[in-house]
Amino acid sequence: MAVVWMQQNFQQLIEQLKGTLGKLGARKLIALGLVGAALMGAILYTSIYLGRPSYETLYVGLSRDDVNRMGLALGEAGIPFDVKSDGSSILVPIGKAENARMYLAEKGLPTSNNAGYELFDNMGSLGLTSFMQEITRVRALEGEIARTIQAIRGVKAARVHIVLAEKGSFRRGDQKPSASVVIRAEGGFSAESAQSIRQLVAAAVPSLDASSVTVLDTNGHLLASAGEGANGAALMTASLEQQVASHVDDSIRKALAPYLGLGHFQTSVQAALDTDRRQTKETTYDPESRVERSVRVVRESGDSRNNRNDNATGVEQNIPQEQIQNRNGESSTEKMDRREELTNYEVNSKTVSTVSDGYSIKRLSIAVVIDQARLLQTAGTTPPPANFVDQQITKIRDLVATAAGLNTNRGDVINVTAVNFLDPAGADMEPVSAPWTDTLLRQSGSYANALAILAAVGLLIWFGLRPLLRDQNVKPAGTEVAIREAGEVATPNFIGGAESVGEGVQAVIGGPAAYADQMKTSLSDLRQRMRMPAKLRLEQMIEMDEERVAAVLKQWIHETASGREADPAKASAMPELKAA
């Protein structure tokens, strides 16, 4: 019986659905079909879009030719891939990157314009001249250096040209090698990187000086050249001054932050440096540490006499005689005595040679601006004491001078001023969050998919389920009038009580839902009614009040004759009533 009742209810539901669809009309049926097709399309698109595999990066920074070749190779291998909007990155599904790289490596992809020492792999030694070997060696060296330069941050592509010295037997002067580097730079490349490239190329090429390397970018801007010796020193000095000023500024901020708080002061530091190279040689002697090394003593004495004869010259002097008589003359005696002493000492000496190749601070200029409102808050009283701000400024000036290491002898200048800040304290120090528009744009794809699904479901409910539910809930006016006219008709109570015929008729006409509500009175009543067929229940109702049942049947016949479509429940109940 339960199976038969379920079959009858299912057939009744099918009949009701057919009747409801028939009442909708052609326009509503077409609209309902379009909404259903749109919903199915949205569901299918969403399932395909969300069900596709996630991708991971295979290669980045590729040229357009490499992307085309790699795309063809991956397509032949049956490996799905995708290309980013920038056109320089290839993506493959997660888990297939290793296989894709191995397959592309087998095909020799991605290729590089900067070929290195692999050039010798494809060259045969037969018929190869020394000139060709030298050219190939230079090309390989250029390619290897270019690959290394491309690994530097901010360098997207590089090209290296090297001119080596030619060896000649009759050449008087030695020719020095030179090199030039052309790079395609992107964000993050600085002037220091250009100097690093010069040092790299100079170290990779024998006998190449860094000053002989020229670096420029693809826009034609000269980044480093041989004639920038003075400019290079000036750039280095400016960089050192900036570093020193930044260090002093950090020291001042660390000293003032606990006292005033971040955002309540601003500092500015300018540093002037002396980067001249100095060489100093100093020799110091210690006279107290002398040691006697040698002593030399010279003594000299002499005795001399001088007699002078006063004899006249004549004939007598020419005659030989035994003895010549001397006449009295002048005589003198001289005696000399001299002593000389020389002592040599060893004295300790110290020679200091100093070479200064660094820098020294010539002058510091420091400016500090303090929020006056913050100073007044630290007073603790309202109004603050007299000259409170001036006293605080004096303390802060001394604190800043100590933190910065100021030296008045070299002309350092410091200025501390208290003013009212325009912006709220610390407003510029708060972290800036990303605007909500950026978040919305990043999630726009997910939002669009969700809105499409919700819109499709809403259209289906509005144009499809809503008319069905509305037609099911609307009862014919004639039925309600007939029931009101019929009144309450007593029906036999199988449990021992009684109920109205109107409730029984409403349960039969209202369909399975109304019939189930009536059967909830008790468990025993439900079981008995489940076993009883509809024909038996109608017969019992007719036996109890034939007049009211006849009135209901007349109303149904009147509705059928007027051209309105009868309810399927009424149509199924009329043959049974006639038979009864």
Swiss-Prot record:
Keywords: Bacterial flagellum, Cell inner membrane, Cell membrane, Membrane, Transmembrane, Transmembrane helix. One of its GO terms (cellular component) is plasma membrane. GO terms for molecular function: cytoskeletal motor activity. The chain crosses the membrane at residues 29-49, 445-465. It is found in: Cell inner membrane; Bacterial flagellum basal body. GO terms for biological process: bacterial-type flagellum-dependent cell motility. Its main location: membrane. Residues 274-308 have a biased composition (Basic and acidic residues). Residues 273-340 are annotated as: Disordered. The keyword Cell inner membrane applies. It is a multi-pass membrane protein. Residues 309-331 have a biased composition (Polar residues). The keyword NADP does not apply. Belongs to the FliF family. The basal body constitutes a major portion of the flagellar organelle and consists of five rings (E,L,P,S, and M) mounted on a central rod. The M ring is integral to the inner membrane of the cell and may be connected to the flagellar rod via the S ring. The S (supramembrane ring) lies just distal to the M ring. The L and P rings lie in the outer membrane and the periplasmic space, respectively. The M ring may be actively involved in energy transduction. This is Flagellar M-ring protein. It comes from Brucella abortus biovar 1 (strain 9-941). The gene is fliF.
